[in-house]
């Protein structure tokens, strides 16, 4: 086993300063280190387009290149930065690359980076209002701004024109957390409603989602203690463009109720990961209301598009759901991690998650006039996430953010038209936002004579494309068929990147088919 080398000669190149006091926040060092870090970031964004999107490294490569044990003695920061450049960057998958089309984007911006940097420097831990009033109030303000941009009902806002509302929001790390905390709240409400003593009735609770729902939902259900046998995955098909069919949902919920189970929670998705399908929010809410089940809307990706009036209809009926989450870190120029969860009645959430140890008690919390965000999440500690979201909205404004969304959608439309213009390919599902699902169609050539052959041809096309380093695309399975996903939205992408990727796809396909 490896061990810490305490021999000073092993690190003779990095001598420790004799008699120097350790000052990790020395003002001169902070300025020097951050200047170098900012220069690195700026250079990275200038050069990332020329880097292979996918790295050519093997598992364990980094331990072979860097020290297996931590150094005993100090090293100049320049040495640390040199190792970052020489060893870490070559092993990165470059999500910031304009040639990255594989997954939903992790967008970023100068304002978000600055906000995240400042929040990290302040390093506040705003678990209660008193622990950092500005951190809590900034988060509340940013969430209410975003709620207005999304035209959410005031019932989801922390503050209304009449003062503090009954609803509100919290910024979490991921959609997984948003689903987990709302599942816990729904679970507890259903247990109370069914007259169960504690968790004794947990085995009777049932939850529902379409088979296109993100896997994180099914994971969160297990974490919340739901019996896997009662987690319903409702089949979808081409007849509903792979969105959840309210009639099938009603059938499943009614069958469970008739069997003595308690329908507890329904997850509707606006913009599924596989194909960008949209579940009909209003109709789903109407079905769930028959059983007093909690309805959550997962709009992690496509929720950002709903700041544009032309996409807002995808949230119609949201006033009848219990919670909704969306992730600005996907498509709203705000770096990871930033998932915004809104609930119509915060008391239902805090009732399940509240903790009040003696050492956290204070007059502000006891007054009921403030929000203690620790009571809307799993943990207690939390980052100052609201700052970067506020800085993005304050710096760019609604119009620029809408322009960003519309530009990505327009570029996706360009790609969709290019695909439709080549009879070797087909667009598999309607393009609702900025994701195009396409494939080499069966019958396009000898290498794709049957549907099964076409599946293999598409798999080979994806692998060949990704090996070039010039583009990165991913796949999914829709209707039993292997499909390529082309997701537009990287912050540095322009139309010429989309067209270049298409030329590479055409060229590679021609080489394969011949």
Swiss-Prot record:
Outcome of mutating residue 359 to A/F/H, per the record?
A: Abolishes enzymatic activity
**Positions of pyridoxal 5'-phosphate binding:** 175-176, 273, 380-381
Alphabetized Pfam families for the sequence: Pyridoxal_deC (PF00282)
According to its UniProt record, the EC number is: 4.1.1.28
Which terms does the record give in the GO molecular function aspect? 5-hydroxy-L-tryptophan decarboxylase activity; carboxy-lyase activity; L-tryptophan decarboxylase activity; pyridoxal phosphate binding
The reported effect of residue 95 to A is:
Abolishes enzymatic activity
What is this enzyme's catalytic activity, as reactions?
L-tryptophan + H(+) = tryptamine + CO2; 5-hydroxy-L-tryptophan + H(+) = serotonin + CO2
Q: Does the keyword Lyase apply?
A: yes
Effect of changing residue 214 to A/F/Q: reported as: Reduces enzymatic activity 50-fold
The residues that hold serotonin are 104, 214
Task: Please list the disulfide bridges.
Answer: none
- Variant or mutagenesis effect after changing residue 330 to A: Abolishes enzymatic activity
Q: Name the catalytic site residues.
A: 359 (proton donor)
Induction per UniProt is: Induced by senescence and abscisic acid (ABA).
Look up the record and name the cofactor or cofactors this protein needs. Answer: pyridoxal 5'-phosphate
- List the keywords (alphabetical): Decarboxylase, Lyase, Pyridoxal phosphate, Serotonin biosynthesis
Q: Which GO terms describe its cellular component?
A: cytoplasm
User: Which residues are reported to carry the modification N6-(pyridoxal phosphate)lysine?
Assistant: 330
Q: Name one GO biological process term.
A: serotonin biosynthetic process from tryptophan
- Biological function: Involved in serotonin biosynthesis. Catalyzes the decarboxylation of L-tryptophan to produce tryptamine, which is converted to serotonin by tryptamine 5-hydroxylase. May play a major role in serotonin biosynthesis during senescence. Accumulation of serotonin attenuates leaf senescence. Catalyzes the decarboxylation of 5-hydroxy-L-tryptophan to produce serotonin.
The entry describes its oligomerization and partners as: Forms homodimers.
- Sequence similarity: Belongs to the group II decarboxylase family.
Q: What is this protein called?
A: Tryptophan decarboxylase 1
